[in-house]
């Protein structure tokens, strides 16, 4: 049990459905979990299990849900306010799609600073680029001039430039080559330690989730089946039959 004053993210009976009338389908079914401040926590499962839908609700991108979402013990309204996004940022699966093709890197990084009225804008851009392993020269490039790994570094920089306390990570390495995946995972790991960030990671990749996370929730058909430590996953120690099959299939 995580003490109340150490809680960063919490969902209570989170339920989400899409469609109308007879076509309405429940995709998340009374999901509850709690993250400690500074923890890296993973949601893993097959495509369509509801994990990305949960992440979008947490980020305020889907306001049609039942149950409660809390950050730092404060229940959030379905429509988030501007201060919320100073504390909570999201990194998406496809870095090319999440960056405006006609905006240079400097403009992509400057936009949130202006929106929130933050000072030292040029210094902040240089600092955050260096923190993700990119030189100042990259500020004058467009997304199509960057490799996949460089684009994802820019996307991470754009999230970090707000100095948030929480990052929501939606399959942040799945669109990248295997060699680049390791670089981005190591970057995310070092950023969490340096900045004392809380991570909620959504992925279908066991290697990714055990590399980055301490605890992992197994999702299936909209339900949270069980929580395991990364160590338990590495050793295949699961209680639920579905989880045992999922772990075995992932190792095959």
Predicted regions and their residues:
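Conserved ABC ATPase "signature" region
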Residues: 122-137, 248
């Amino acid at each position: 049990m995580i003490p109340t004053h150490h809680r960063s993210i919490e969902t209570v009976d989170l339920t989400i459905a899409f469609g109308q009338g007879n076509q309405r389908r429940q995709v998340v079914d009374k999901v509850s979990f709690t993250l400690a401040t500074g923890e890296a926590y993973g949601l893993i499962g097959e495509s369509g299990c509801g994990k990305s839908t949960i992440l979008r609700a947490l980020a305020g991108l889907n306001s049609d849900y039942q149950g409660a979402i809390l950050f730092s013990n404060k229940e959030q309204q379905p429509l988030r306010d501007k201060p919320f996004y100073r504390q909570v940022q999201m990194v998406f699966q496809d870095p090319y799609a999440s960056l405006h093709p006609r905006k240079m890197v400097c403009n992509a990084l400057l936009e949130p600073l202006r929106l929130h009225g933050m000072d030292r804008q040029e210094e902040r851009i240089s600092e955050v680029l260096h923190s993700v392993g990119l030189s100042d020269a990259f500020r004058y490039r467009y997304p199509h001039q960057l490799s996949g790994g460089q684009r994802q570094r820019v996307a991470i920089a754009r999230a970090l430039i707000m100095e948030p306390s929480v990052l929501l990570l939606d399959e942040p390495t799945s669109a990248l080559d295997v060699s680049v995946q390791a670089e981005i995972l190591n970057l995310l790991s070092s950023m969490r330690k340096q900045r004392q960030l809380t991570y909620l990671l959504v992925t279908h990749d066991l290697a990714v989730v055990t590399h980055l996370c301490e605890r992992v929730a197994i999702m299936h058909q909209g339900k949270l089946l069980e929580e395991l430590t990364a160590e338990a996953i590495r050793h295949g120690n699961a209680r639920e039959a579905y989880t045992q099959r999922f772990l075995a299939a992932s190792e095959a």
